[in-house]
Regions:
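STAS-like cytosolic regulatory interaction modules
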Residues: 1-56, 67-108
Length: 108
């Protein structure tokens, strides 16, 4: 199932392996859509978020990702950010939060 914000700047879906696939900007408008998808994780295995089609994350989007990481750690698991590009990596580095996630870089 795909969820989309009213401005169509963000869509979130799950693939067959349970990976949360994000398309668009994770900002104040789209953050609640991602938050809703993250709240549906069962907490028994790592949460994998595919960010290959994400080029912008604002502070509210970062808060959403950090909250997911905190909840995962509380349950004894982790959050994997897959397909992280230079724009998103820069935000994580500037904010000193790269250690909160397992990071898999974007190919190419």
């Amino acid at each position: 199932m795909t969820e989309m914000d009213d401005n169509h700047s963000l869509s979130v879906s799950r693939d067959a392996d349970g990976v949360i696939v994000v398309h668009g900007d994770i900002d104040v408008a789209g953050g609640p859509i991602l938050e809703a998808a993250l709240s549906k994780t069962d907490g028994t295995r790592p949460v994998v978020i595919d960010l290959d089609d994400v080029f912008f994350i604002d502070s509210s989007g970062l808060r959403c990702l950090l909250g997911a990481g905190r909840r995962a750690r509380d349950r004894g698991t982790s959050v994997v950010l897959r397909g992280v590009g230079s724009e998103v990596l820069r935000l994580l580095e500037i904010t000193g939060t790269t250690d909160q996630f397992s990071i898999e870089h974007r190919n190419g």
